[in-house]
A protein has these predicted regions:
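Structured catalytic-domain cores with a bias toward divalent-metal coordination
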Residues: 2-6, 13-15, 36-384
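Sec-dependent signal peptide recognition
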Residues: 19-28
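N-terminal signal peptide c-region/cleavage motif recognized by signal peptidases
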Residues: 31-33
Length: 384
């Protein structure tokens, strides 16, 4: 009996040994651990954004569905998520809030090729084009389907028009996951805009949010920083992307670089470089941020609005980025037969930040924006 059972005992022992060996090697090969410099580290959990699930150390691109509404307009938001191998903050970069602001969109095409999720800490969400209907429709300011400005539509509505539903998706799906947020713009298809600048709310969101937003604005590395005034008593009042974000307690900045629908590296590279600099500042990639040594800070802006519909004739001697004095002629508006209706002059001395550069003009269009600063360079307010 014993003799007859011995081969079976040996066989059972060998089977158990083989089974343990298989289990061991399966665990070694497929368990979520990394061994680095003698340390064993548990990989962190995957990052989830709507239907996307991104394992640590990987990059995934996908389309975030914008729920359909009564208008019958369907759309999506193209995103790329880098979920770094190591823990860290979540930074969201949003391009294409306005469909004809191309510099941010092209920059967000280039940035992913410069990053390796295996060498990153934290998580980066790139919104390639927030407002796809406006991009596809080649429209400025407004969505072609509902004629609404996405950057005046936050926090959005789940059952609203397509622009309101895009705002709602960004508010409900992107913002709650974000520790920091950057809304990247350029001058629209009709606007000349120079110099490139970063901007933050200097009064909204509380002291810590203001301080961290200022940190982002400086880390972006541009030579000019604009301080937005004002705060918001409710989320419904915070109709701008970054205003909604800071009112929710998320440090945020705007960036402006580019103009007139032009694709030019002189505008695109500062966005890409600035994003990398912020990633370094937040410890998400290796290296030190590259910041401006003494950036100009603009704390007050003066705006000029058109009083008439007609044709805008920009003064040929005036260029954005130049210093203008109060009373400088910026251009004239004529009717469709050439009769002069309005001479537009600078309402304050300062840097001409934005100026219409194409002929169409409507009543109450914001033709020009001036960053009000004293004429003497020695008296300009600068970051210390």
């Amino acid at each position: 009996m014993l003799i007859n059972n011995r081969p079976q005992v040996i066989l059972n022992h060998q089977f158990r040994y083989l089974s343990k060996s298989i289990v061991y090697w399966v665990c070694v090969l497929f368990s979520p651990i990394v061994v680095a410099q003698g340390d064993v580290k548990q990989l962190r959990e995957p990052f989830r954004l709507m239907q996307l699930e991104v394992p640590a150390g990987e990059r995934i691109s996908g389309k975030l569905s914008v729920n359909g509404g009564a208008d019958g307009v369907d759309t999506f938001i193209p995103v790329t998520v880098f979920h770094g191998r190591d823990s860290g903050p979540v930074l969201s970069l949003i391009a294409g809030i306005h469909g004809s602001e191309y510099s941010p969109i092209i920059s967000m095409q280039r940035l992913p090729e410069l990053l390796d999720p295996q060498a990153m800490a934290g998580t980066l969400i790139i919104v390639h084009i927030a407002n796809l209907p406006a991009f596809q429709g080649r429209s400025i300011y407004f969505g072609p389907d509902d004629l609404k400005n996405l950057n005046r539509s936050f926090p959005g509505k789940a059952d609203g028009t397509v622009t309101e539903r895009i705002a709602f998706t960004l508010t409900e799906e992107i913002m709650p996951l974000s520790d920091y947020l950057i809304d990247i713009h350029s001058g629209d298809g009709n606007e000349s805009l120079r110099p490139s600048y970063s901007a933050y709310y200097a009064e909204a969101g509380g002291a810590e949010v203001v301080d961290q937003s200022r940190r982002l604005a400086v880390a972006f590395g541009l030579e000019t920083i604009v301080q937005f005034a004002g705060s918001y008593s409710s989320l419904d009042d915070a109709i701008y992307t970054s205003a909604q974000s800071v009112t929710r307690g998320i440090p945020s900045i705007d960036v402006e670089s580019g103009e007139l629908g032009v694709i030019d590296d002189v505008f695109i590279d500062p966005i890409t470089d600035g994003a990398l600099s912020v990633l370094r500042e937040l410890g998400m990639i290796e290296g030190e941020p590259i910041v401006a040594a003494n950036p100009l800070v603009i704390s007050d802006r003066a705006r000029v609005y058109s009083e008439y519909e007609g044709i805008w004739h920009k003064d040929a001697l005036v260029k954005t980025g130049d210093f203008v004095t109060k009373g400088t002629e910026l251009g004239v508006i004529t009717d469709y037969f050439g009769k002069e209706l309005q001479t537009v002059v600078a309402p304050a001395s300062g840097v001409l930040l934005i100026l219409f550069a194409t002929p169409p003009v409507n009543v109450d269009d914001n033709i020009a924006v001036i960053g009000a600063v004293p004429p003497s360079i020695s008296s300009l307010d600068r970051v210390q």
